[in-house]
Amino acid sequence: MLRTLVTFLLLALASVAFAEDGARSEFTDSRDGRVYRTVEIGGQVWFAENLAYAAKGSFCYGGAAKGCSERLYPKDVAEKACPAGWRLPSNDDFQKLYGYAGKTGVRSVGNALKAKSGWDRNGNGFDDFGFDAKPAGYCESRKKCEYRDCFLSMWSSTENISWSLYCVDEDFNKGTYSKTAALSVRCIKE
């Protein structure tokens, strides 16, 4: 009982301590009129959802050219996909997000960034900061896609580096992919 109370109090204090972060807003992409939710985390302003702009060379999970709410991008397309005033985050940007989200010490970074719903295998998170990371899968090629409801990997601008969340893992992991793999994009404000 005491342990539960202490955990609850720590969560409440963490929520208050980080209340000034998590400032939410919206951004309208002038290229297609789509409105994106944004959130400030640790002094950085991020899209609070995956990019869905239909840049040439991007595609929907499974290879379709259109008709989806989010898209996957090979590395060369990802590097130019964010709208004016926004950019593909660097490895340093992701490291800063990781460090900030890990400061609470109450739960894992992955669970703090994952959305509260949408993940298979009981992989939902707590979305402590409004990042709202939802699974989108990835594609090794246009027709070879996997893990739609269990995996999110986001390109960084740093050579072949991506950051990923898994439904069966509570961390936020740095990894590498071939430049031809198609991953999600989260834009960060310049």
Predicted regions and their residues:
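NAD-dependent ADP-ribosyltransferases
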Residues: 1
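Sec-dependent N-terminal signal peptides
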Residues: 4-13
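Conserved positions within compact, well-structured domain cores
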Residues: 20-190
